[in-house]
Amino acid sequence: MAKKRIIGIMGLGHVGAHVAYSLAVQGIADELVLVDQNTEKVASEVQDLRDAVAYIPHRVTVRSADFTEVGDCDILVNSVGKIELLRGNHNRVTEMDFTIPAVRGFADKIKASGFD
């Protein structure tokens, strides 16, 4: 039996939600692990994806988690950001003022989860 392909997606805004959907529909992952600080958003995305994968020809498991539960993932996609910071400003570096401290806030949790 082949090893289960598990991909974690951190941040379920515009980018993260689309990445999750694309991975599910294309059959790239056997399991998607969704992480976001907004628990209502995570629950909504998990349910939407579970509904969608019911109609595709391959099996994909979708679950929510927090940063401490990503140790079994093969790949982590970091799509954490704050797109609102770009309104009226098309310089993507502006968003780094949010993203750098955010990554520092969860990096140790990811390490502690056993992700390598």
Which residue stretches match the model-derived regions?
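Extreme N-terminal starter segment of soluble prokaryotic enzymes
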Residues: 2-7
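Hydrophobic Val/Ile/Leu positions in short beta-strands of Rossmann-like dinucleotide-binding domains
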Residues: 8-9, 34
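Glycine-rich Rossmann-fold phosphate-binding loop(s) that bind the pyrophosphate
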Residues: 12-13
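N-terminal Rossmann-fold NAD(P) dinucleotide-binding loop
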Residues: 16-17
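Aromatic pocket-lining residues of Rossmann-like dinucleotide-binding sites
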Residues: 23
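Conserved glycine-rich Rossmann-like NAD(P)H-binding loop of the short-chain dehydrogenase/reductase
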Residues: 30-38
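Conserved N-terminal Rossmann-fold NAD(P) cofactor-binding segment
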Residues: 37-73
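Rossmann-like NAD(P)-binding element
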Residues: 59-115
